[in-house]
């Protein structure tokens, strides 16, 4: 297992509290991708095919064609669709070059099934986003 990938994952806030052994398992599942400016990663109303963790660069998040957020290194998106297999609640487009860690639905499910800490981190992050969307 390349230590480089584990080290990169260890710097992502989502993986805080995850042991090195658990990180090694997650690292064995993930893919790393380089994305071009203007690339649509998730389309509102369409099935979500992947979970993304940004390593560098930024993405714009829109809902109903209106900007709602800008995400950067350490941020992640696509988790809701990974959990419920429903359609995306927003569109996400790269705003310049982006380096990201990507997990397919199967990879994501395997990662959270094997790691209670990671599952709790994802749930906590989802709750935080729901509160932010509700304005509370």
What are these model-derived regions, one by one?
Residues 1-136:
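Cytosolic regulatory regions built on CNB/CRP/Popeye-like sensor folds
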